[in-house]
Amino acid sequence: MSTQVNRLISLDAMRGFTIAAMILVNFPGNGDHVFAPLMHSVWNGLTPTDVIAPFFLFIVGVSIAIAYTKRLDKGLPKGDMYKKIIVRSFKIFAVGIFLNLLPDFNFAEIRWTGTLPRIAIVFLVCALMFLNTKWKTQAWIGGGILVAYWLVMTLIPTPGEGKVMLERGVNLANWIDNQYMPGKMWQGTWDPEGILSTFPSIVSGISGMLAGVLMLSNRTKEMKVILLMVIGFFMTFAGYLWGLTFPVNENIWTSSFVFVTSGIAFMALGAFYFLVDMKGLTYGTKPGIIFGANAITVYVLGDVLALLFYGLKIGGQSLNMHFFDAFTALGMAPKLASMIYAILYVCIIFIPALIMYRRKIFIKL
């Protein structure tokens, strides 16, 4: 394979803005006052917030295709790459568990799933798959997983219910979490990063690998943009059609959800590539590049600093609520005040990210 892409600045920017968006929606000034687009869907449906996690898995897939194609072209031993993949996956997973233990380090209530553990699993499976299969095989595997998940979820009755259920808390994926998931679960009896839903989440990474293969092809830049947009459009359209029988749902990562969000990610990558790498647009993209240079570190920093802003009590009230009350005292509507705080929090996280970027400190797990 010819590697015509040396460095996709557009991918760095997309990664950074995705992380910034993740921090923005995770840390509002007041969780009771949040604009609907900045909230996850309660169950079925899709909000802009629902797109963030699959975007990051998609970006992981693109990065795998670019990074490991270069290493294969250099003739590096696969055995060495396997070791590094396993070690990196373990590190990302371990950091995720560490964040789950904060602030009390209560091992009896440990949560074994979450954003970083899922990223670790998707990275591990996708990277090993990429080193040992061609893109067509990867596409077939991804499609097979989605079809199998669809059939399992829509044909196998939930034990104890006597019929197929796709509702919250009583579907097969949630039942499996309740029966077999160790430790604490995010929703008490089930987890949005649960056991069964992890399989289709791997396909979000596979879709990114396929996009990465496209970016590495000998096609012209213009043709790459066209293909990204066309593929993305048809994936999104097909996903919503699939959603008529298997609803678009982030909580159980339905097959239709994978298609819709992967399609949007294809189009987003095409837009970023056109604007940044083709047209050289730098205005407004630099913050994304800075965030993207240390994406996981920035994510971890957001969680750790939250202990201060959400945990430290001054006068019986947390710092975030002091900011929220100050903004509302200025006449802001509660939801606007909550969003302004979230933007301010992203800006605070940006400061150490900028310092690391300027000093060329890039922390790679």
Regions picked out by a protein language model, each given a short descriptive name:
Residues 1-365:
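Alpha-helical transmembrane segments and their immediate juxtamembrane cytosolic regions
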